[in-house]
Amino acid sequence: MYQYDVEAFMSACDRKGLAAKTMKSYEQTLRLFGLFLAERGITQTEEIRHPHIEAYIDTVRERGKYTVCAVQEPVSPNYPERRRDYGKKVSPVTINNYLRNMKAFFNWCVREELIRKNPIKPDDTIKVERKGVVP
């Protein structure tokens, strides 16, 4: 089950001594992706295919910033709708970070023999325009 696999992955990351910031980023990314999967009735890690990854990227692009919360009941409300950037486009850098975090999870799943291959393809990352770089 995806949710249990994520918990096992997080435990493995903790045993490896990954930084707290990295752990938080992984967990948040994988929870948000888990919500996306649950909305589509996907509960098993082995059910996830490349078209799900593409659909998730499209969904992230369309929904905008802060429109989904990784935690169902936050400890304290932070009123994301009050932010000036609420609903604005999610940057390619952020989407690439999500993909990198998801790729780490799926690579772990392959090593643990939970899945046969990583559903994220190398060309899924988005080309990022660099600001202020002069050739």
Residue ranges of predicted features:
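Onset of an N-terminal alpha helix
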Residues: 2-6
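N-terminal core-binding DNA-recognition domain of tyrosine recombinases/integrases
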Residues: 7-24, 31-133
